[in-house]
Amino acid sequence: MNLTVYLSGEIHTDWRQKIMQGAKDHGLAIKFTSAVTEHEASDAAGDVLGKDDNGFWRDHKSSKVNAIRTKNMIQNCDIAIIRFGDKYKQWNAAFDAGYCAALGKPYITLHAEDIIHPLKEVDAAAMAWAQTPEQIVELLKYVTSDS
């Protein structure tokens, strides 16, 4: 089974690379997509439309430009993996989870046990909760297997 998997969330660790490498190591037929993970590039996505000294309007333009990419990728994915890290609050990841839920797209959350409570609604709509990228790879192995 060929799948497209959208990787959403925390950008400060190598969890995406671990999942992609694990899928490659197991020969899984998976195409991975993701939002722009370079923070500065994402923040500047709307600058092409004109510089803005007001932080709100700069962020507003950039979020709309970024949404062109993320909305299409979420709409076209088979599964989303949504990572919530330990250090920062990932509002974008929570938004992506809600969008997946609204579209009926299955998603798996990836986060530590100590943030279960604040993510209870996000986890309730998820198909699974994993704590490590290795668990995600095992789940992907299972859902792509022919048996």
Give the ranges of each region predicted by the language model.
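Conserved catalytic or regulatory cores that recognize and/or transform ribose-phosphate-containing ligands
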Residues: M1-S147
